[in-house]
Amino acid sequence: MLSIVVRAQADKVMVTYKDDGIRLTVNGKDFVVNGMNWDYFPIGTNYSYSLWNDSDETIRQALDTEMGLLKNMGVNTIRVYTGIPPKWIEYIYRTHGIYTMLNHSFGRYGLTIAGAWAPNTEYADPRVRDLLLKEVQTLVAEYRNTPGLLLYLLGNENNYGLFWEGAETENIPMADRKSTQRARAMYKLFNEAAVLMKTADNTHPVALCNGDLLFLDLIAQECKDVDIFGTNVYRGVSFGDLFDRVKKEYGKPVLFTEFGADAFNVISNEEDQTAQAHFLKGNWREIYENAAGLGKSGNSIGGFTFQFSDGWWKYGQTLNLDVHDANASWSNGGYTNDFKQGENNMNEEWFGICAKGPTNAQGLYQLYPRAAYYVLKDAHQLNPYAPGTTLAGIQRFFEGVSIPDAALRARGDRAASAGEKGKILRLSRFGAAFTSFNTGGSLITTPKDPDPNNPVFPNQLGFDHMQSLFVGVEANPSPNMRANIELNVLGNVAQNPIDQIFYENRGRPVQLVGP
């Protein structure tokens, strides 16, 4: 009997330096990251939900729907946090041809140290160091041979976490440099983790995720062994001097781990698909223009648009999870379409390039592409590494990417989304509750049968039942106004519950005795 074991073969991904710039290569071929920040959160859930806890059939249906849409628009890589099983990374790759950048948060949202939860990670703490290094070593051991794995990403703008007290996005205190000492300890640990990971796996690069360029000087000093400078950047339609600064001050390739625009206008107080598409078009144009071989900075290897679908849980995190909140939680002058000095204009729950539909009985939902989806579908047809590509050619290409045309294509999706949600008025609840009560015992004063001349409660031994009908109507005339009314129609009200105070007892029949 002959037994043959075939091992899954992972791709060899490398960062290559040439005179004309820096490239990411996969099995020797140039690879530009047309990426998307992807997650799966049905309306009504938050960060505590995980798709990977569902059945394989449910996961497969969710992935096939979402990855099909992503592949259709030209996405070749998704950014996913740890927790996704290796088999689904492989499934996404083999079924849909999409790679995964695996993201370890590296203490961004707190850690459990010695049995106690610490919301703000102190990277200089030896216990933190030991825990995080152990976690990334375990991560590499589990995923390094997974087909479809593109690279590892450490953190998520952890430098901002040195200022913020929680996970919710806030304004950034850029002038506050009191955290420099904490930041240095953090970046040293990033580098130490990268060394360990690359020692165990030399076929997948390691990137860090920074918030914009804050502490770039420390990164250049402390993170010499990190392969890729990943950065979350929200500057509006242009990244400004970012490419040149990273080239001069750090010398590593630039990978935008987050960037984008929300699809809500706080001035007009309504969805604004055109503005979102405008900002993303400008961002991707600069990403391609700064790729290697085109005469500019030559250090851009791609990016991950933020994000694929709206996160209805982002504002408040645990409250109003079934409400698409229009509250703006931070301000950014780069988004000139709705910026007012002193007022917030960034709406965390509206960053999706797809709107999200209601959840069905299986826990799945449909997506409805916005204009930005169609703009990116056109933009991702460009390959900056294709022979004959020039800066002038890229400029002509993007002049042909039409936002009005994309908005027209998205109108049908918007109408379908609004129709499914019942935009202005909808039935929010319709149900019935039937409850039985049994009262019994030998050492009690409750009568065996009800006595109309002695209306005591409980009024009898044995069984009785309750009937309630619930009807709810919700009005949503505008994104910042929502009203809901619920009616409880009582049928039969039980007379024998031992608890004498309960909501339904107001519906007990009252017997009036006349003269």
Task: For the regions a language model picked out, list residue spans one by one.
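Gram-negative (and chloroplast) outer-membrane scaffold detector with strong preference
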Residues: 477-515
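Extracellular loop and loop/strand-boundary signature of outer-membrane beta-barrel proteins
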Residues: 124, 181-182, 450-460, 502-514
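Aromatic-rich peripheral "rim/lid" segments of glycoside hydrolase catalytic domains that contact
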Residues: 306-420
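Transmembrane beta-barrel domains of outer membrane proteins
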Residues: 198, 472-474, 515
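Non-catalytic scaffold segments within catalytic domains of secreted glycoside hydrolases
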Residues: 134, 207-226, 231-240, 262-304, ...
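Short glycine/proline- and aromatic-enriched beta-strand/turn motifs that initiate or cap beta-hairpins
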Residues: 410-477, 482, 486-490
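Active-site clefts of carbohydrate-active enzymes
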Residues: 111-118, 162-172, 250-290, 300-301, ...
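Active-site mouth of glycoside hydrolases
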Residues: 25, 29-229, 239, 247-249
